[in-house]
Amino acid sequence: MQLAWILWLASVLPPQAADSLCLSATVYLEARDQSARGQQAVAEVALRREESGLWGDSMCDVVTARKQFAPTIVSPRTRLGNTEAWAQAVSIAIESERNWALPPGERKEIVPGASHFMAHAIAAPSWRNAYQVATIGDHTFLRVQRLRPREG
């Protein structure tokens, strides 16, 4: 299946299903070759951004914000062809959403406060000197600014 098809499907699904699909695609594209912990950390960054409201009002808005996550960086024709990795990404996304639905004090956070991450194989972005929260696999997770949950 192609990324373009997944994003189209997300546009016609009910919001909760669409958000799960968008998060799954992001975990797959960003971290399919990483450990489960690395995949959970990627999902956590996306969920933290969604909660902040600074990158959009839904998970699909967050992960399709210009040049923020793989769904807007890779070609829409990118095939998500590894069925085992896709199944793992879906599982990680759903598990991460359940965890993030808990009150903040009860969540299991892997990269506390991280709002960004970078793959070591990619050129370092301008915020590369932010506070490093963790390195998991070939990703470094960073806190660039203090994110506050939106009110209400």
Show which residues each predicted segment covers.
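Bacterial extracytoplasmic/cell-wall-associated proteins, especially those involved in peptidoglycan
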Residues: W8-L9, L13-G152
